[in-house]
């Protein structure tokens, strides 16, 4: 249904083969002209492509961050500084630069979205277990003015 709607809207849609089953979605590329054409996240083999001019980069980054979503984004460019700009300024959980957009390695690469796409790292990565911790700071002045150092160092008998 989603793919058919985009065809009706006049977007270029490319599929590996026609979809003949309601239970299967063929890998699909949908070329859209602006980010606001996306109204919800799509899960499945659907890739949205946006072509943009250099003069539109800051607007596109702003649109990405204001969309509310941020699971995965792919950037394909020969301009290293542009890839760096997108990766630094876009609030996205997983950013793939000049490569395929699959293959987060559970256990070593954090994987999770931002905003409406999730709440950060869900699997893998060195900080994964940190989400299960409840930090507490206790600060005690053990040498308060007038304190007796000998009394402060008495050990309890076992």
Q: Locations of the language-model features?
A:
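Diglycine-centered glycine-rich loop/turn motifs
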Residues: 13-17
């Amino acid at each position: 249904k989603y793919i058919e709607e985009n065809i009706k809207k006049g977007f270029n849609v490319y599929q590996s083969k026609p979809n003949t089953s309601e239970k299967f979605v063929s890998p699909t590329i949908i070329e859209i002209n602006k980010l606001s054409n996306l109204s919800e996240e799509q899960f499945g083999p659907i890739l949205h492509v946006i072509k943009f001019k250099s003069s539109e980069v800051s607007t596109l980054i702003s649109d990405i961050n204001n969309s509310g979503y941020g699971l995965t984004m792919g950037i394909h460019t020969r301009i290293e500084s542009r890839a760096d700009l997108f990766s630094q300024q876009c609030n996205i959980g997983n950013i793939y630069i000049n490569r395929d957009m699959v293959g987060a390695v559970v256990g070593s690469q954090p994987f999770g979205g931002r905003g409406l796409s999730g709440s950060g790292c869900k699997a893998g990565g060195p900080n994964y277990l940190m989400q299960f911790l409840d930090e507490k700071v206790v600060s005690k002045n053990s040498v308060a003015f007038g304190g007796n150092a000998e009394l402060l160092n008495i050990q309890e008998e076992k």
